[in-house]
């Protein structure tokens, strides 16, 4: 009798279930380190459980946010520097939650690739866990998708989903009024927006990712991969102190587009651009691309990653509290009658 022909396996089609299982086991300790009050289940179930009552909430309202890190991923992939891209993913979600007045509670990630490389994926997800731990947010689940034929070799994509809560009636923005002051919290560089433009500028410059950064510091690739700052704990401390009327996360759209999102109809903002120094990375991008200042202001954070809108009589107290939490705090402007954002002074 002829030997029976071996049948096709899932691995033959390019999906390695054993690699997926190995990844889950490898990242379990990192996920476990993010556990917080309310965490009920660990990784591996069909769904993840979270107990709002155990987290201390009486009459909670849930807030959800989802995001990615855009084409910053391309730099991480091309340089092999993937250890902090997970921090970016978490920051893009939890910083948005805080702007609603919510405390981040738990996080789920989606990691997709053509061929799962366990060591690479573990580095990425350990970065996600680091961001979660720094935000008091539990990493309670996720999805790893190995999809042959969908991605070029070595490529991957990331998405994150975060849920937070606040007690009913504590949502932001709330009480924003003419005369409120704007406190700017320093950014850590470009953060996670505008990277299609950044990559185009690097292409125009003729520099490689391993070249020294023209604006100082490490290699160009590493400098541009500086992770997005997490503002959660310090922003929540300010909110709980009272006097904070709104928070604006400065992401895609820059100062020009993001601040109006938290201002009620009939109110605008005046920002003094001479109040802070434009970080060198933005000056280099603008000069290399001959970028006009208005375009810069509606593309990048320009050194201000979060704006805190505060009652004028509480501004000094809130600024001191934020500084004590390690923030670089700058009074950058005020709320005025009108619409949109107007600027005094120059950055460039």
From Swiss-Prot:
Record pathway: Purine metabolism; IMP biosynthesis via de novo pathway; 5-amino-1-(5-phospho-D-ribosyl)imidazole from N(2)-formyl-N(1)-(5-phospho-D-ribosyl)glycinamide: step 2/2
Secretion signal span: none
GO molecular function list: ATP binding; phosphoribosylamine-glycine ligase activity; phosphoribosylformylglycinamidine cyclo-ligase activity
UniProt keyword Ligase present: yes
Keyword Ligase (UniProt): yes
Enzyme Commission number(s): 6.3.3.1
Gene3D superfamilies for this protein: PurM-like C-terminal domain (3.90.650.10), PurM-like, N-terminal domain (3.30.1330.10)
Subcellular location: Cytoplasm
Any one GO BP annotation for this protein: 'de novo' IMP biosynthetic process
Catalytic activities: 2-formamido-N(1)-(5-O-phospho-beta-D-ribosyl)acetamidine + ATP = 5-amino-1-(5-phospho-beta-D-ribosyl)imidazole + ADP + phosphate + H(+)
Key words of the record: ATP-binding, Cytoplasm, Ligase, Nucleotide-binding, Purine biosynthesis
Domain of life: Bacteria
Gene Ontology CC terms, in alphabetical order: cytosol
Family, per entry: Belongs to the AIR synthase family.
HAMAP family: AIRS (MF_00741)
Name the UniProt record assigns to this protein: Phosphoribosylformylglycinamidine cyclo-ligase
Originating organism: Cereibacter sphaeroides (strain ATCC 17023 / DSM 158 / JCM 6121 / CCUG 31486 / LMG 2827 / NBRC 12203 / NCIMB 8253 / ATH 2.4.1.)
């Amino acid at each position: 009798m002829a030997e029976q022909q071996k049948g096709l396996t899932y691995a033959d089609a390019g999906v390695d279930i054993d690699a997926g299982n190995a990844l889950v086991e490898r990242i379990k300790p990192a996920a476990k380190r993010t556990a917080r009050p309310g965490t009920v289940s660990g990784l591996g179930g069909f769904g993840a459980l979270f107990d709002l009552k155990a987290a201390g909430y009486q009459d909670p309202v849930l807030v959800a946010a989802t995001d990615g890190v855009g084409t910053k991923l391309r730099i991480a992939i091309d340089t092999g520097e993937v250890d902090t891209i997970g921090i970016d993913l978490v920051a893009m979600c939890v910083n948005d939650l805080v702007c609603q007045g919510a405390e981040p509670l738990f996080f789920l990630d989606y990691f997709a690739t053509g061929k799962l490389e366990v060591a690479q994926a573990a580095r990425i997800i350990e970065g996600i866990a680091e961001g979660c731990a720094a935000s008091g947010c539990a990493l309670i689940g996720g999805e790893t998708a190995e999809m042959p034929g969908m991605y070029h070799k070595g490529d991957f994509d990331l998405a994150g989903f975060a849920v937070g809560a606040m007690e009913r009636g504590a949502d932001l923005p709330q009480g924003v009024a003419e005369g409120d002051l704007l406190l700017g919290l320093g950014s850590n560089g470009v953060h996670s927006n505008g990277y299609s433009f950044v990559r185009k500028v690097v292409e125009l410059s003729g520099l490689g990712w391993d070249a020294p950064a023209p604006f100082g510091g490490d290699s160009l690739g590493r400098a541009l991969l500086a992770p997005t700052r997490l503002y959660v704990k310090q922003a929540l401390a300010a909110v709980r102190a009272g006097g904070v009327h709104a928070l604006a996360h400065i992401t895609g759209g820059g100062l020009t587009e993001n601040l109006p999102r938290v201002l009620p109809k009939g109110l605008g903002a005046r920002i003094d651009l001479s109040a802070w120094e434009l970080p060198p990375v933005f000056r280099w991008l603008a000069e290399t691309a001959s970028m006009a200042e208005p375009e810069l202001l509606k593309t990048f954070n320009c050194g201000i990653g979060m704006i805190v809108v505060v009652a004028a009589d509480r501004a000094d107290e809130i600024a001191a509290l934020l500084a004590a939490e390690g923030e670089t705090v700058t009074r950058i402007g005020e709320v005025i009658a009108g619409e949109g954002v107007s600027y005094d002074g120059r950055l460039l």
